[in-house]
Regions:
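Conserved, structured C-terminal
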Residues: 1-183
């Protein structure tokens, strides 16, 4: 093909991947790629499920105005040793968040989706909410990431319940990521 492309070894799925940027009509490149053995087209739902399995936070879900990097367990990437940067003072005052990101794994086929409330078993007051959730094709179980109150003493193995369309569904807190491909 006589077409310029920008090929980036990037992605947001936890898998090896490439992003191809094309000026103009990408259809010939698309057809060439699909003709290769092992290449399958997929959509954004596939990308988002892989992101969730890899435990990667996404802005608008696990990151945003309501959640700091500390809430998303990303405090280690902030360099407070730098003299000054935009937001440094605000981040210094947010080192101890009220909510923190946890991984949840369930059983069966009922996945807790974004904004579903999370409860301690038998309790009526929500302790947080799901930020991302799906049925994991890789693990064959429902998984979710949730922002939960840090003052509840939750740890890996703790049991919680998700309100899935009016029914309490049991989940256990698990270590993130849910899945990491062997390299």
């Amino acid at each position: 093909l006589d077409q310029d492309v920008f090929l980036a070894r990037t992605g947001y799925t936890g898998e090896d991947g490439f992003e191809i940027f094309v000026a103009g009509d990408p259809s010939k490149i698309w057809q060439l790629l699909l003709a290769q053995d092992g290449v399958e087209p997929c959509g954004l739902a596939c990308r988002d499920t892989l992101r969730l399995e890899a435990g990667m936070p996404l802005y608008g879900h696990e990151l945003g105005i309501d959640y700091t990097p500390f809430s998303a367990n990303l405090g280690k990437v902030i360099r407070f040793d730098k003299d000054q940067f935009v937001g440094k003072q605000a981040l210094e005052s947010a080192k101890h968040p009220d909510y923190r990101l946890f991984g949840l794994a369930g059983q069966g086929r009922r996945a807790a989706r974004a904004d579903y409330e999370i409860f301690l078993p038998g309790e009526d007051v929500a302790i947080g909410k799901v930020t991302s959730g799906a049925l994991s094709p890789t693990l064959q179980e429902p998984i979710a990431m949730a922002m939960l109150q840090v003052d509840q003493g939750l740890e890996v193995g703790s049991e919680v319940e998700a309100d899935v369309r009016g029914t309490r569904v049991p989940y256990k807190i698990v270590q993130l990521p849910f899945y990491k491909r062997e390299r």
